Amino acid sequence: MACPFFRRADSLTRQPSVIAEPGGHWALEDEELSDDALTLTHLQMAIQLLTAPSNEDLNTAVTSLVAKYRQNWPNIHKLKLDPQTFKSCANYDYLADIQELLLKMDEASASEILVLLGEELITCCCTGIIERAFRCLGTDLQEFLGSLDGVYDVLKLQEEDVTDTGFVCAGEGELIFTSERPVIAWLLLGSLKALTRMLYKVDVNIKIEPVEGDARRYRYLFSLVKDNSQTMLMGRPTSVSKTIPETVQRSNSSNASDLQMNSSSFCKMFPWHFIMNEQLELVQLGRGFSKLYKPYMADFGCQATTYFDFKRPKGLTMKFRDIVRRTYTPFLIGLNNPPGAVDFPAIGLEIKGQMVHCPESNSLLFIGSPFLDGLDGLTCNGLFISDIPLHDATREVILVGEQARAQDGLRRRMDKIKNSIEEANSAVTKERKKNVSLLHLIFPAEIAEKLWLGSSIDAKTYPDVTILFSDIVGFTSICSRATPFMVISMLEGLYKDFDEFCDFFDVYKVETIGDAYCVASGLHRASIYDAHKVAWMALKMIDACSKHITHDGEQIKMRIGLHTGTVLAGVVGRKMPRYCLFGHSVTIANKFESGSEALKINVSPTTKDWLTKHEGFEFELQPRDPSFLPKEFPNPGGTETCYFLESFRNPALDSELPLVEHINVSMKTISEGGDA
């Protein structure tokens, strides 16, 4: 035989990977496999070992092969690879590399090595649940080959596999395998040898030969080795017959008249059967087929293809001999509309069953059942439950299918209700987040949470709170000369900057009334830098005034007052509640603002004491006269006075840098836990 790998140069391209990739045909890794229960997934894995072994399984088999046959082929160790090689590349095709290495190493022995590799593949990897999956296919080799044909056909249909790979059990001891990869065909030869020994304790010779006219098809012919003289070709020991009762061992008659059932009873028992002769002419119909087609046969003949469409197996040639070769494959037959028939009730009905060769009459017997999924499919095809034999499991399939459909309908309704509830919950959660966010904009976080939960909020005293009051100099005059829209637009631009300062310095905006803007620090998160934050904000507010003008082009001028002291804070009102500050310190802070001047920051003695605990704040050289102190401010001995805050310089920075740079760096430092 010519080299098994001979092919044209253009066919030496890399073949598609045989790895079970995520989302691919096999996708076995994603399923949870039971250690005990045999499932369809295990059958998939078992047959994949024959048709598309994984890189891991191949590497295991190669390792064993190298250990056993290193002396026979010194260079065989080159086939072995580090597992990381193909683990790092999901699409790596190990089998293609094995094929190329064998062609370079020893072309004459390439097929022999591949057969041995197939045997090692079964020996090393066919264990546990995979071995059980192979054993469930049949009690002997012939049954195994026949089941391999039928099971693989079903698996391909379920996985929507459009490749040409497949098995055909063409007769006793004959298997035809289709594959575009010759290397798989030779690997399968060794795998079948090892499986025969493992499962049925039989040594067989398997001859492989190409099928004439199709380079992708290979025929495997099984023959028994001489040492197994006590064993039949297909694995059944001849000694078993000794245990069978003598009455059962009687040879069956091939005379139809000796059958214990007449044709009428057979047609009644199996309504969905037919028998056809070598010319594929119908010679007998079951009661179900007879009811549908008998009126038309007198006019249109008895040719089977007139009434039946053979849908599966795929690629079946409508010749008697070819059908006989596919008797191990499930058949799916569709019912045709008879010529001239009007309103044929069973058009499109499919019958699934088995084709049996009857050598005594050289005919073919088909026995099947309607391929239905529910009562609707039954009635739509003009059938009744009575048309399904009592022994046929299709009855249970139809009735159980209806029950499952009702359960699915209930499940879908429940899922729809569940989705509606989840959508409603999601909408409620979304609205809740909006409301909570809005409350956090108006109130301190602790107060906002209590308001949302509906908890009672008691007024609370806070010590060392630094309060800022500000207003616009000449605001009444500005309002008298401008329209309300102009005034609102001016305040909107100015207060937008101030609100950003509140977020940056983490201070609480108490309220705005007209041109008055009030903030406080030390309410929601007390810190030794509360006075510093308010002072820095005051400096940035004065700086921001230079960037805003009135309607007539004049610069906005503000005056600001700062004071630090104890305040009482609480929520007032139920409709549109407000978080208000009360106490002597609030009044004094407002007085310091009234006693300030345009573009000046009037600082109380208590606030100055807090600011001077750290370097950087600059005040006017000459303190103000004590008479400028508010009358409400306690000043025993008349030694205290107020001060104008002029600027701030971070000692660690160049003094020539802008004021904003000094403030931003200092704020960043204390935010990170450092010392301003």
Curated annotation (Swiss-Prot):
Sorted UniProt keywords? cGMP biosynthesis, Cytoplasm, GTP-binding, Lyase, Nucleotide-binding, Sensory transduction, Vision
An example of a Gene Ontology cellular component annotation for this protein is: guanylate cyclase complex, soluble
Molecular function (GO) terms listed?
A: GTP binding; guanylate cyclase activity; heme binding
| Subcellular location per the Swiss-Prot or TrEMBL entry | Cytoplasm
Give the primary localization class: cytoplasm
Q: Does the keyword GTP-binding apply?
A: yes
- Disulfide topology: none
Question: Which reaction is catalysed here?
Answer: GTP = 3',5'-cyclic GMP + diphosphate
The answer to whether keyword Nucleotide-binding applies is: yes
**What EC class does the entry list?**
lyase
Q: Which SMART domains match?
A: CYCc
- InterPro entries reported in the protein's UniProt record: A/G_cyclase, A/G_cyclase_CS, H-NOX_domain_sf, Heme_NO-bd, HNOB_dom_associated, HNOB_dom_associated_sf, NO_sig/Golgi_transp_ligand-bd, Nucleotide_cyclase
Tissue specificity: Head, where it is preferentially expressed in the CNS and the retina. Not found in bodies.
EC code: 4.6.1.2
Q: What Pfam family is a match, any one?
A: Guanylate_cyc
Residue ranges constituting the Guanylate cyclase domain according to the UniProt record: 466-593
Entry's Gene Ontology BP terms? cGMP-mediated signaling; G protein-coupled opsin signaling pathway; positive phototaxis; response to oxygen levels; visual perception
> What family name appears in the similarity comment?
Belongs to the adenylyl cyclase class-4/guanylyl cyclase family.
**What is annotated about its quaternary structure and interactions?**
Heterodimer.
Q: What does this protein do?
A: May have a role in phototransduction. Catalyzes the conversion of GTP to cGMP, a common second messenger that is utilized in a wide variety of cells and signal transduction pathways. A second subunit is required for enzyme activity.
Could you tell me what this protein is called?
Head-specific guanylate cyclase
Gene that specifies this protein: Gycalpha99B
